[in-house]
UniProtKB/Swiss-Prot annotation:
This is 3-phosphoshikimate 1-carboxyvinyltransferase. Belongs to the EPSP synthase family. The active site is at 295 (proton acceptor). Pfam families: EPSP_synthase. One of its GO terms (molecular function) is 3-phosphoshikimate 1-carboxyvinyltransferase activity. Its main location: cytoplasm. Its EC number is 2.5.1.19. Signal peptide: none annotated. Monomer. It is found in: Cytoplasm. It comes from Picrophilus torridus (strain ATCC 700027 / DSM 9790 / JCM 10055 / NBRC 100828 / KAW 2/3).
């Protein structure tokens, strides 16, 4: 679907969608651990729906009312579909191994390109057998033998999270090396704690205690990586209140508050469960480390396109292995609005050039589409946005939320 967006900005209120980093973990762990859970504030993004379908394939009964209730009755599935969800693929791989399943995992084309090697290597040492096929991977853990593990987390913290879930359901300890995005490990620890699993953690070493709890009721906190789009828009356009954001969140992308407040004349106001963003002037260059916050790179790059300060994206090469090659796509988006790009081995710098307005923008990556829309609204350009349906992967309510800020969609 292709759309244009019209209207004039007005101050408004946004409810941040659910953090799928939390919701996917809760859904999958409930299904594989046989522990029921009731979840409030689930936005039903494509990635969350994939996790729910995996839970169903494992025998879980799913009920939808004002909240989402998962009543598991675990059985090893013959097959599951991970779609384009890297999180579901990696977490389910460890969980299937823990339950000694023989299962085929379907993957969409883009997911087949994303790394899984380090996780496969660690599980293979436990006699888990993997066979790569054209449209997915076959895992056979029927003869697996649990033991202590070492995992290299240098390419993805999800490998570490997957093995943490594996050991929480089996036995043995875990040593994780070269952990990137350590706050995602904290999300996994909180998930396990909420299911009654105690986690001892010290310098990448993890041990697990098992006191399983029943009948959990959990409210999923709002997602900072989704809120980032509105934060950037508000910095250029005016006041936006964003609700359902915990001030003490362990989400790594909550770092956006300190990143912005460190360079902004007007600070983001922070309350217990909401923030307020104001139009501001920037006082210095912005630095974003992709090893810590890869999902913030697309929206924060917009600041370099339209402001007097530069955006420095550190460790940018890691962007190559996201849902798309976001390194190339950020450069494409920035240049389409006239920005200047400089690169060295470890840093990409985006600076404002002579502002230009593209006639159309075409990305398949959900975060790039939403970032482009925010850039277009800041520029006030008449732009055709393509593949708009792909934003459902993470933020199905994005277009509706635009209406809270004075905009409307022309299809």
């Amino acid at each position: 679907m292709n759309v244009r967006i019209s209207g004039e900005f007005r101050p408004g209120v946004i409810n941040a969608p659910s953090s799928k980093s939390f919701s996917q973990r809760y859904i999958l762990y409930s299904a594989f651990s046989n522990i029921p859970v009731t979840l409030k504030n689930v936005s039903f993004s494509d990635d969350e729906r994939i996790a729910l379908e995996i839970a169903r394939a494992c025998g879980a009964d799913i009920e939808f009312n004002d909240s989402l209730t998962i009543k598991p009755d675990f059985r090893c599935p013959d097959e599951i579909n991970a779609g384009e969800s890297g999180t579901s693929l990696r977490l389910a791989t460890g969980l299937l191994a823990a339950r000694r399943c023989k299962t085929f995992i379907h993957e969409e084309a883009s997911l087949l390109k994303r790394p899984l090697d380090d996780l496969i290597k660690t599980l293979s040492e436990k006699n888990v057998v993997f066979n790569n096929l054209d449209n997915g991977i076959m895992i056979d853990a029927s003869n697996s033998i649990p033991s202590d593990s070492i995992i290299d987390g240098g390419r993805s913290s999800q490998f570490v999270s997957s093995m943490m879930m594996y050991h929480s359901l089996t036995s043995g300890s875990l040593k994780a090396l070269n952990i990137v995005s350590n706050d995602y490990i904290k999300i996994t620890i909180k998930t396990l704690n909420d299911f009654g699993i105690s986690v001892y953690s010290s310098n990448g070493f993890f041990e697990f205690g098992k006191t399983l709890m029943k009948g959990n009721k959990i409210c999923i906190e709002g997602d900072y990586s989704s809120a980032a789009f509105w934060i950037v828009l508000g910095l250029f356009k005016g006041d936006i209140e964003i609700k359902n954001l915990k001030s003490d969140s362990c989400q790594p992308d909550a770092a956006i508050i300190n990143i912005i407040n460190g360079i902004s004349e007007r600070k983001i106001d922070i309350y217990n469960n909401k923030i307020v963003v104001h139009k501001t002037r920037f006082l210095g260059d912005l630095y974003i480390d992709v090893d810590k916050n890869p999902d913030l790179a697309p929206p924060l790059s917009i600041i370099g396109i339209f402001s007097d300060v530069a955006v420095h994206i550190l460790n940018y090469r890691r962007l190559e292995i996201k849902e798309s090659n976001r390194e190339e796509n950020i450069i494409s988006m920035a240049r389409s609005f006239g920005a200047l790009i400089e690169k060295n081995d470890n840093e990409m710098v985006i600076r404002r050039g002579k502002i230009s307005l593209p006639e159309r923008i075409s990305f398949s990556d959900h975060r790039m589409i939403m970032s482009s829309i925010i850039a277009g609204l800041i520029s006030s350009g008449d732009i055709l946005y393509e593949n708009i349906e792909n934003i459902n992967k993470s933020y199905p309510g994005f277009l509706n939320d635009l209406s809270n800020l004075g905009y409307y969609i022309l299809k």
